[in-house]
Amino acid sequence: MKKLTKTNSHRQQKLASIINEALIEILRRGKMLDSRLFNCPLTITKVIVTADLKIANCYFLPFNTKLTINEVMNALNNSKKAIRNFITNKINVKFSPDIRFHYDHGFDNAIKVEELLKNIQVLGDKLNH
């Protein structure tokens, strides 16, 4: 019987962890990055590496920034070469994975779910009175 869920291999998880740590370090240092990222606090929420280890999907969440999501995405993409070089020096693999940045919608979705639950509770309270 086939598994319904796909699990990441140990190599995928280890590489994702190393990339996550390297991203945090280079973003903290700020060297070689697009200048728009200097005053833009970012959290790398997760890194998912494909099974062939060729692509690393990196999810981010900006905090307290005047930049739009697209501006942050463009700044990260402009810094991609420097980020990839930095990561290449941190990992020991034949080929460095292509880094792809994605906005993490998880926080926004959690807020929406919380609002929906509050609305349901308010409606339930109105029906009970």
Swiss-Prot record:
Family in the record: Belongs to the RbfA family.
Functional note: One of several proteins that assist in the late maturation steps of the functional core of the 30S ribosomal subunit. Associates with free 30S ribosomal subunits (but not with 30S subunits that are part of 70S ribosomes or polysomes). Required for efficient processing of 16S rRNA. May interact with the 5'-terminal helix region of 16S rRNA.
GO cellular component terms given for this protein: cytosol
Annotated compartments: Cytoplasm
Keyword Cytoplasm belongs to the record: yes
Keywords: Cytoplasm, Ribosome biogenesis
Keyword Cytoplasm attached: yes
Principal subcellular localisation of the protein: cytoplasm
Origin: domain of life: Bacteria
GO molecular function: ribosomal small subunit binding
Entry protein name: Ribosome-binding factor A
A GO biological process held by the record: maturation of SSU-rRNA
Summary of subunit composition and partner proteins: Monomer. Binds 30S ribosomal subunits, but not 50S ribosomal subunits or 70S ribosomes.
Source organism phylogeny: Bacteria, Pseudomonadati, Pseudomonadota, Alphaproteobacteria, Rickettsiales
